[in-house]
Amino acid sequence: MNIQDYNKLIEQAFQNKRNKAVALVINSPGGSPVQSEFLADKIINLSKEKNIPVITFVEDVAASGGYWLACAADEIFASKASIIGSIGVISAGFGFDKALNKIGVDRRIYTAGKNKSLLDPFSPENKDDVKRLKNLQTKLHDHFISFITLRRGKKIDLKNKDLFTGMFWSGQEALELGLIDGIGQVNSILKDRFGNNVKIKEFQNKKRFFDLGNLISITFEVISNKIEEKLIFKKFGL
């Protein structure tokens, strides 16, 4: 998910000042923290500007960047079986240096700037590189925690030591921890809140393809993103 794909849709959702609320339906195991922040900030700012409340409804999962985005809302609802949380930062990769040695291949790197080859997967792991990455992760994690604490406030159970460790919970457990506000689905909650005659207008992202080059480029990007997304969903057993 990124701001370019959803920027116009978000603006359209807030255009009608007569709207009683904007419902944000999320099914995401995470992604870029930067894009999650961009999207969340966009929603929060428009909500304040238009004075329209936002309600998040979680489907299968709202984890990591998905939960960051969920917290852009004033309220969060989920199913009892939804997966919620994973408030943490992760970096993953592979080390291929031993494989290269086995097949007799030399790795040659030429850089201007001593840190340009930081964390190169074809070179032996460097303790200073790992330390640098860990420091960066800690700063990102602290920023993530600050945002969640700001948005959820006194609702969350800060006494729970696992809250910000990257742990994830079922919807029912998340409710008890204050990570969400209730159990329920979008249609039933909105009808209870605004009456049986409530009208729901959906805004969905649809990519357009203009030429073969663009089609091929976007197709490969979509396939790559789908594979990565599927692997992350597998982490949560979905």
Features from the language model and the residues they span:
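N-terminal organellar transit peptides
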Residues: M1-S79, I90-L238
